[in-house]
């Protein structure tokens, strides 16, 4: 921070709960009737109300001012927590966040699906630090709801599409898997539909809803290659892998064998130092770094090796890219280089002119992030941000850069470049190739407008 940059500015957090529960229930009811026009209008109205939702934290910030003479009562008066004993150990056998952070939650998008069992919850990226997403805030994507499966009864079967591809088909118990040599690695997971609501135009107000189908964890498990070696897989004939889940949708996805041969694919049972959460596939899930989240099969019960892609339901009907000419692009699983500024971002309010730390996240499904550039004038000029350690392959990377806000409108953007040299595109560049009728793999540059009032809005530049 430069010595002449003036006082540090104050920032009001985004009103993550700007959608009232009653309104959410109403929108879901209308969704079941197929009234998509109502859904769009409802979310637009909610977005317009986000500014009003910011009034409460803004009022809170103003209600506890520092006296002009510098006599801050929070320093001069001894607080209750400094006068006696606090809570005892093991008040909670499993620690919980502070009650003052109760607003930091996963949240759903009303009307996105007709049932909450086949829906999404979004991670509060704007409220997180570093690169690791707490397991309790990890985004959710379910196709038939989540289950808490008894690990003592769960099995993983590995077989081939014929008797020659897998010499020794096997069934593993959880105990057998957890006795094998394990690895622990940090990776991001992103739903292919992340930012999908923004293809045509601005649709949602906050970072949580634009980019919140994204999380990053340390995953622990057995490399799938190890299990294949135990089963005698013929790598020359078996060039594709099918993962199958034990949930009600029996989710199945094809994974190219070269990803398994690289040693990156993990049959995981651990996440962030503990067992997987039920919402994340407990007791077993497939971890396929760099690939869209639908391929990270949860409740993993079977793996089959074959000589051709399987064309499963969610490959032949869903998770395809609609191209401008009317054709569908299939098996586009890799998540391209992408970034988003989390502070300042939509719904937040800058209360003062002065110094701010612009912070955000960058990632690439093709390797490490090499550089992130930041612009505050809509892309006319760029400065290179600091990449914070660690910078890992196919993992979130935190970036920061100093900024002195002069109180005038600013268009804040980030642009990531990965180690292959790929540069994150603008919406104009991406739409020239993909048009606006797609759902998946939107990795365009995100723009936040900091208004003269200090309020931050989601905008798109032509």
What are these regions (language model features)?
Residues 64-462:
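Structured, non-membrane catalytic/scaffold regions adjacent to prosthetic-group chemistry
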Residues 14, 29, 36-40, 44, ...:
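General helical structural elements
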Residues 1-37:
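N-terminal secretory signal peptides
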Residues 10, 18, 57, 75-77, ...:
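Acidic/proline-rich low-complexity IDRs
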Residues 7, 15, 54, 72-74:
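Terminal low-complexity, poorly structured segments
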């Amino acid at each position: 921070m430069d010595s002449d940059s003036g006082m540090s500015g104050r920032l009001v957090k985004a009103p993550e709960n700007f959608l009232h529960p009653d309104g959410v229930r109403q929108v879901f009811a209308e969704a079941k009737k197929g009234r998509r026009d109502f859904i769009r209008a409802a979310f637009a109205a909610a977005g317009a109300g986000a500014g009003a939702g910011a009034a409460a934290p803004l009022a809170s910030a103003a209600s506890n001012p520092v006296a002009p003479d510098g006599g801050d009562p929070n320093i001069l008066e001894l607080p209750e927590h400094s006068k006696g004993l606090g809570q005892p150990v093991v008040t909670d056998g499993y620690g919980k966040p502070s009650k003052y952070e109760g607003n930091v939650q996963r949240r759903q998008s009303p009307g996105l699906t007709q049932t909450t069992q086949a829906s999404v919850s979004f991670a509060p990226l704007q409220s997180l630090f570093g690169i690791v997403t707490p397991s309790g805030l990890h985004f959710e994507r379910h196709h038939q709801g989540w289950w808490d499966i008894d690990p003592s009864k769960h099995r993983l079967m590995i077989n081939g599409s014929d008797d020659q591809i897998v010499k020794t088909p096997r069934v593993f118990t959880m105990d057998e898997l957890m006795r094998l040599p394990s690895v622990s690695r940090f990776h991001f997971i992103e739903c292919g539909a992340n930012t999908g609501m923004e293809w045509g135009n601005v649709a949602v107000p906050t970072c949580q809803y634009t980019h919140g189908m994204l999380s990053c964890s340390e995953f622990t498990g057995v490399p799938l290659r190890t299990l294949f070696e135990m089963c005698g897989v013929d790598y020359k004939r078996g060039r594709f892998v099918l993962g199958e889940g034990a949930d009600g949708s029996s989710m199945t996805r094809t994974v190219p064998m070269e990803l398994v041969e690289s040693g990156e694919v993990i049959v995981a049972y651990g996440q962030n130092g503990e067992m997987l959460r039920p919402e994340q596939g407990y007791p077993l899930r497939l971890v396929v770094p760099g690939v869209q989240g639908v391929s990270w099969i949860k409740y993993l019960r079977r793996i089959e090796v074959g000589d051709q892609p399987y064309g499963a339901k969610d490959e032949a009907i869903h998770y395809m890219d609609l191209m401008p000419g009317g054709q569908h692009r299939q098996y586009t699983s890799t998540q391209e280089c992408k970034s988003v500024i989390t502070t300042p971002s939509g719904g937040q309010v800058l209360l003062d002119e002065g110094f701010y730390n612009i912070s955000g996240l960058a990632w690439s499904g093709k390797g490490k992030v090499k550089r992130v550039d930041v612009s505050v004038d809509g892309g006319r000029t760029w400065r290179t941000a600091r990449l914070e350690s660690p910078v890992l392959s196919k993992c979130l990377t935190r970036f920061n850069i100093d900024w002195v806000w002069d109180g005038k409108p600013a268009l804040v953007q980030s642009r990531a470049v990965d180690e292959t040299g790929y540069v994150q595109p603008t919406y104009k560049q991406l739409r020239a190739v993909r048009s606006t009728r797609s759902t998946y793999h939107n990795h365009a540059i995100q723009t936040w407008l900091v208004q003269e009032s200090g309020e931050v809005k989601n905008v798109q530049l032509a």
